[in-house]
Regions:
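Short beta-strand->loop structural element characteristic of the AMP-binding/adenylate-forming
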Residues: 54-57, 84, 107-114, 183, ...
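Conserved ATP-binding/catalytic segment of the ANL
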Residues: 228, 236-283
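Conserved AMP-binding A3 loop
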Residues: 41-65
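Conserved pre-ATP/AMP-binding loop-to-beta segment of ANL
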Residues: 6-16, 23-45, 52, 75-81
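Gly/Ser/Thr-rich phosphate-binding loop
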Residues: 19-20, 103, 130-134, 144-204, ...
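Conserved S/T- and glycine-rich ATP-binding loop of Class I adenylate-forming
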Residues: 40, 46-49, 82, 125, ...
Length: 283
């Protein structure tokens, strides 16, 4: 017991006075105008892998951008039980634990482990009959080194993967062991699902898939020219026709970094890829 609080008319010795605490709190000021779609609804920090972390602000249209994430990429139905392995403090959590899944009417299995162990994940899938799993490639690398014959994974129907490039060997091994193809996707804290392998597409190991139709995705060189198949280019989102659902509003209180990443009708992801002959994006 660390703190005692009294709600009575007078606080006894050793107790904090609840009513005095309320009086000392800052008063709530009702906003003059109601929220609009353009107002900030949530903020997430980037991981800071390529520099200082940035505070990414999304507006109230952001959840709608995840309709494609849940209903199509995750291939969810009302009978689905989906598990995304991601810490709640990161943007990937709302990718897989909230917006797209709820909009699809699916069930969400939340498991925030203190320490990751492959066996614990497999046990949860078995015991709770998880039907859909999304995790980074690293997780699947650990899973394929377990003896999967010890677990009943018959409920598992669909698996998606994001966060880093997928090793083709992991794809092939997991498919051999489970019969399930890993469907890769790509996006950022600043976006929703941007490039992905959808259910109606044949996955190509090592490829992210094709652009999400809600984004005008292009690959450009240092001169701003769209690259040809086989050439490397930066992944960009063209916004000259308007801001697409799911794209961030700004880096909070950082106009310079916002302009640096998003200017002249183009959002620059900073990530590099190339197109194969079928238009699939590869890293």
């Amino acid at each position: 017991m660390k703190r005692l609080v009294s709600v009575g008319p007078e606080a006894p010795e050793g107790f904090e006075d609840f009513h005095k605490g309320i009086e000392a709190a800052a008063p709530f000021v009702k906003p003059e105008h109601p929220n609009t779609n353009d107002d900030i609804s949530l903020m997430y920090f980037t991981s800071g892998t390529t520099g200082e972390p940035k505070m990414v602000a999304h507006d109230f249209t952001y959840p709608l951008g995840h309709i494609v994430t849940g209903s199509f990429w995750h291939n969810l139905k009302e009978s689905s039980l989906h598990l995304t392995i991601a810490d709640t403090g990161w943007g990937k959590a709302v990718w897989g634990k909230l917006y797209g899944q709820w909009i699809a009417g699916a069930n969400v299995f939340v498991y925030d482990h203190e320490k990751f162990t492959p066996a614990a994940i497999l046990e949860k899938i078995q015991d709770y009959h998880v039907t859909s799993l999304c995790a980074p490639p690293t997780i699947f690398r650990f899973l394929i080194h377990e003896d999967l014959t010890k677990y009943d994974l018959s409920s598992l129907e669909y698996c998606t993967i994001a966060g880093e490039a997928l090793n083709p060997a992991v794809f092939e091994t997991f498919k051999k062991l489970t019969g399930i193809k890993l469907m890769e996707g790509f996006g950022q804290t600043e976006t929703t699902l941007t490039v992905a392998t959808m259910p109606w597409m044949e996955p190509k190991p090592g490829s992210m898939g094709l652009p999400n139709p809600q984004y005008d995705v292009d690959l450009i060189d240092n001169d701003g020219r769209s690259v040809e198949a086989g050439e490397q280019g930066q992944i960009v989102i063209r916004t000259d026709k308007g801001k697409p659902l799911g794209l961030f509003k700004e880096y909070y209180r950082d106009a310079n970094r916002t302009h640096e990443a998003w200017n002249n009708g183009i959002y620059y992801t900073g990530d590099v890829a190339w197109n194969d002959e079928d238009g699939y994006r590869r890293r």
